[in-house]
């Protein structure tokens, strides 16, 4: 099997597929509140195009898929997309990232279709604050979604918490306490300068050393834990006696580019080898031309930089490439 390897020796076996750029929320770090233009439906990859693409990609070593958006559960055919991917025997793991507003309704059908596990965005445990950060989200719907995911067996359940200075950094201890009572993995993620968030991100950025300080201040004893299924770049820990775990993902303060194994496919059919850089290849016209398609995929991988240089932006230093101005919802979070 010919593997998808870049010039730094990194083998790519994981892809994140965005199935929509639309979302029912407007999280402050992801999308502006208004003035948005979304892709016309005919510009979005169809279920058949996604499945055909993956039937080819598995022949080159891709074996893990994460479905993203926008909010993927807005797709009326999301269960059929999962079912189509689940029918490809080489795919070992199918996961989804969701805001969970519709998860309680769809978790059982998604599990039956072949979904393996779920990541849920949850940036506050206080209903009013959660509504403010998401510009309209209802915390109880997320909690109901978590419960339903537990009931149907979508394990491990991971909660993604973007740490935002002055907005939710006073809840770190509450999130850590949450892991004591539930068998879930809470992942604290540094605020990143992507798209819309890139203009004001320094005001909201906190390094993830803040998490460990909060543990120490609360007298929580913690220790590293072995790899959690699908843990990716997360460094994981367990508070003594806790049922669950917590992790830290620090793309800015300590990048993990040397072990990056992922590609991204946008909802409109562009391959991106690096989340941060602007370069992307339009593969949609060649979905049914495997030779040309794989040439473009390999070209994207060949052009992948050694690292994303987000830390240089933190220091106002010059970067070697042009950062993306796509929103996270347009790339696929």
From Swiss-Prot:
SUPFAM superfamilies in the record: Radical SAM enzymes
Pfam families listed in its UniProt record: Fer4_12 (PF13353), Mob_synth_C (PF06463), Radical_SAM (PF04055)
Signal peptide: none
Radical SAM core domain residues: 7-221
InterPro entries: Aldolase_TIM, Elp3/MiaA/NifB-like_rSAM, MoaA, MoaA_NifB_PqqE_Fe-S-bd_CS, MoaA_twitch, MoCo_biosynth_MoaA/MoaC, rSAM
EC class of the enzyme, as a word: lyase
Cofactor dependence: [4Fe-4S] cluster
Record's keyword annotation contains Iron-sulfur: yes
Alphabetical UniProt keywords: 4Fe-4S, GTP-binding, Iron, Iron-sulfur, Lyase, Metal-binding, Molybdenum cofactor biosynthesis, Nucleotide-binding, S-adenosyl-L-methionine
Disulphide bridges, residue numbers: none
Residues that hold [4Fe-4S] cluster 2 according to the record: 257, 260, 274
EC number: 4.1.99.22
Keyword flag Cell membrane: no
Catalytic activity: GTP + AH2 + S-adenosyl-L-methionine = (8S)-3',8-cyclo-7,8-dihydroguanosine 5'-triphosphate + 5'-deoxyadenosine + L-methionine + A + H(+)
Comment on bound cofactor: Binds 2 [4Fe-4S] clusters. Binds 1 [4Fe-4S] cluster coordinated with 3 cysteines and an exchangeable S-adenosyl-L-methionine and 1 [4Fe-4S] cluster coordinated with 3 cysteines and the GTP-derived substrate.
GO molecular function, one term: cyclic pyranopterin monophosphate synthase activity
Residues reported in the UniProt entry to bind [4Fe-4S] cluster 1: 23, 27, 30
Binding site for GTP: 16, 66, 97, 158, 262-264
Binding site for S-adenosyl-L-methionine: 29, 70, 121, 192
GO biological process: Mo-molybdopterin cofactor biosynthetic process
Quaternary structure note: Monomer and homodimer.
Function summary: Catalyzes the cyclization of GTP to (8S)-3',8-cyclo-7,8-dihydroguanosine 5'-triphosphate.
Family: Belongs to the radical SAM superfamily. MoaA family.
Name of the featured protein: GTP 3',8-cyclase
Organism: Listeria innocua serovar 6a (strain ATCC BAA-680 / CLIP 11262)
Name of the coding gene: moaA
